[in-house]
Curated annotation (Swiss-Prot):
Name of the molecule in the record: Pyridoxal 5'-phosphate synthase subunit PdxT
Function: Catalyzes the hydrolysis of glutamine to glutamate and ammonia as part of the biosynthesis of pyridoxal 5'-phosphate. The resulting ammonia molecule is channeled to the active site of PdxS.
Record flagged with keyword Lipid metabolism: no
NCBIfam families according to UniProt: PLP_synth_Pdx2 (TIGR03800)
EC annotation from Swiss-Prot or TrEMBL: 4.3.3.6, 3.5.1.2
Length: 204
């Protein structure tokens, strides 16, 4: 199978490597490729949308003519992992913890409301062990992370974190074939990439 990583910004190399390691661990034959153009989305069995800065990613995708095609691919049922700013890009409702509504380009395919920069600035980044439904306990790295303020069906919360500033917050969501995280699993684990590959292989 061929799996793609949106390569406009963020931890592209880390996602590619996580897919390669996940495939090896599952004994699945998979080619991990960078996606920068709409035509490179054709024939993908799975997709990852990395973090970075969600407004920049959305505007770049729009300028490159890839935003609408991305939406179509995700809506068509291609198993998708979206991390941090990638999760923001997927959400139907987005606001910033400081400036409020953002008006940024969105895919708007995930039934979730997201608050950007919910934990503060870069210096407020942190790590925590997180129990994720269906995946297990993972070490999660939160870098200028968002939170999911709410979800509605068919999306559901699959992980929470208790934080002194943000309180008890949803930090991972699943909606059918989509996994979205507020943190960066590509930095610490292959668990989420394995889950997406297993969806693509019809195992999960």
């Amino acid at each position: 199978m061929k799996v793609g990583v949106l390569a406009l910004q963020g931890d592209v190399e880390e996602h590619l490597e996580a897919f390669r390691r996940a495939a090896a661990e599952l004994n699945i034959s998979a080619e991990a490729v960078r996606v920068k153009r709409a035509d490179q989305l054709d024939g993908l069995s799975a997709l990852a949308i990395p973090g970075g800065e969600s407004t920049t990613i959305g505007k770049l995708a729009q300028r490159l003519g890839i935003l609408d095609r991305l939406r179509t691919v995700v809506e068509s049922g291609v198993p998708t992992l979206a991390t941090c700013a990638g999760a923001v890009l997927l959400a139907k409702e987005v606001r910033d913890s400081v400036v409020g509504p953002t008006g940024q380009p969105l895919l708007a395919v995930l039934n979730a409301a997201v608050v950007r920069n919910a934990y503060g600035r870069q210096r407020d980044s942190f790590e925590a062990n997180v129990d994720v439904e269906g995946i297990g306990t993972v070490r999660a790295v939160f870098i200028r992370a968002p939170i999911f303020a709410k979800t509605w069906p068919p999306a559901r919360a699959i992980a929470h974190v208790d934080h002194p500033r943000a309180g008890r917050a949803i930090v991972a969501v699943r909606q059918d074939h989509v996994l979205a995280t507020a943190f960066h699993p590509e930095l610490t684990t292959t668990a989420f990439h394995k889950a997406v590959l297993e969806m693509a292989a019809g195992r999960l």
